[in-house]
């Protein structure tokens, strides 16, 4: 699956959640609430990673793949809601980091 499809499916799913929010609470969550939900799920990923590495046990270790997927979902939704292209965000970050590491002090410019 490419990032464009991730964005399309994520935003379609988010629209369905907005319908549920309007039904249950009379309004949709704002960008800030979506960002907080992402941070909550990212924290859960951290906690489940501790279990995965044997650092702190959890009875919910089987949730790790879904929580990682949910974090990607939130990021795609947040990018879309803030008028950013998710694929461009990811590509730009990776290109920037690759360039920074290529030119890091002590590097000869060649892969080790």
Task: State each model region's role.
Residues 1-68, 72-112:
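Flexible "arm" and connector segments at domain edges
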